[in-house]
Amino acid sequence: MTIFEKSTSGRKGYELPEYELPSVDCGIPEHLVRKEKPLLPEVSEVDVVRHYTELASKNYSVDKGFYPLGSCTMKYNPKINEDMAMLFTQLHPMQPRETIQGAIDLMGHLKEMLCEITGTDDMTLQPAAGAHGELTGLLVARAYFEDKGELDKRRKVLVPDSAHGTNPASAAMAGFEVVELKSGKDGCVNLEELKAHLDENVAVIMLTNPNTLGLFEKDILTIAKMAHEVGALLYYDGANLNAIMGRTRPGDMGFDIVHLNLHKTFSTPHGMGGPGSGPIGVKKHLAPYLPVPVIRKAGEKYDLDYNLPKSIGMVRSFYGNFTVMVKAYTYILTMGNKGLKHVSDMAVLNANYLRAKLSKIYKVAYDRICMHEFVIDNEEFVKKTGVKTLDIAKRLLDYGLHAPTVYFPLIVHEAMMIEPTETESKRTLDEFIDAMEKIYNEAIENPELVKKAPYKTPIRRLDDVNATKYPVFRYKK
């Protein structure tokens, strides 16, 4: 039942004082002024509290259980991060600069830490999410080539067929032509394929390393050399940075632009649309094009530098999602250098433990040592049982587990992409393995049981097609 359906005429939670001020003409055009009162629910405070408490109890989150969503890094978010963020909630970005020096210092220290982790020279913290960071990075690349007088010819962005869908979308939004690179049989970039497409018309090569198959791009130094020899830039999608912290750095691999997901790698909560944070780091030759303001060290303090004539301009109001930065800063300070390295080591160990165990039951697309995630290929399983990857995912819900990412990456048919993260214990991983084995046996012995799952969730299977074609965004009587 929606909150609107619980509405009772005349019921109130609070009564506001009489409005005694004179009416003011706000200059709103007459045709835009509401003619009728908004349709708002009339409910008491206890109705509201019970309604949303009930909804919360039906929700699933990493605080409730295992969340192996591939390429999403759904790690546990320490609650100390929230405590620290609360300390800054009384600040306002329009305060005089001298009164927010603590916040500016925090952003400055965070920027330096992230530059050190990624091997970049400068950074903006403004972008609000990963895809926003991608677009910002590509706009920086565009400004760079425009400044060099090469934008007219450099119109192409090369993107592997295993890439996140946001990569080609961001490139197109930035005004580039997207060229797809077919992966090699080993799941990595095919150097011959790259060589065939790489010329002086290429502006950027976008890569994720490890890639979305959970495999490290072993030829990354060669790829970087090939890109730079023709004057192209190498862009790093930071979605999978959780696998390599303290072991290697994108900047050392030859990447010119690096975007991060603070809401993934650095344990700030994400999902359901936000809040996120997608900073981008760059090498020195791209620093003049970063969004303003850039945080600079000024003596013993940090300051905001707006004096960048070649900047692409602001990409986000004020300074970005600041409290998300506070949480990431807290996480980095808590973990330290050794802790972050251990995070990546455990993420890789957990993924390989699951891969080794599940490969005895399911077919792993690339069954060799992986990084932080791996992909199951269920194509033969579907032919054998009639049970699809989606059915397995739905059945997992009955076992109290969140499903992995399904049907991505697109180059693996009936894909199931599993990323356990570093925060899960062996006991939890074994529970997941046990559930996956039971579902496998159910699919063979009683496929209809799996096809009709889930059975224990508040809502069973949604009509995805109609929900996509005819979405309902607001309540109507």
Swiss-Prot record:
CDD domains: GDC-P. One of its GO terms (cellular component) is glycine cleavage complex. The modification N6-(pyridoxal phosphate)lysine is found at K264. The keyword Transferase does not apply. GO terms for biological process: glycine decarboxylation via glycine cleavage system. It comes from the Bacteria. The keyword Mitochondrion does not apply. InterPro entries: GcvPB (IPR023012), GDC-P_C (IPR049316), GDC-P_N (IPR049315), GDC_P (IPR020581), PyrdxlP-dep_Trfase (IPR015424), PyrdxlP-dep_Trfase_major (IPR015421), PyrdxlP-dep_Trfase_small (IPR015422). SUPFAM superfamilies: PLP-dependent transferases (SSF53383). Belongs to the GcvP family. C-terminal subunit subfamily. The glycine cleavage system catalyzes the degradation of glycine. The P protein binds the alpha-amino group of glycine through its pyridoxal phosphate cofactor; CO(2) is released and the remaining methylamine moiety is then transferred to the lipoamide cofactor of the H protein. This is Probable glycine dehydrogenase (decarboxylating) subunit 2. It comes from Fervidobacterium nodosum (strain ATCC 35602 / DSM 5306 / Rt17-B1).
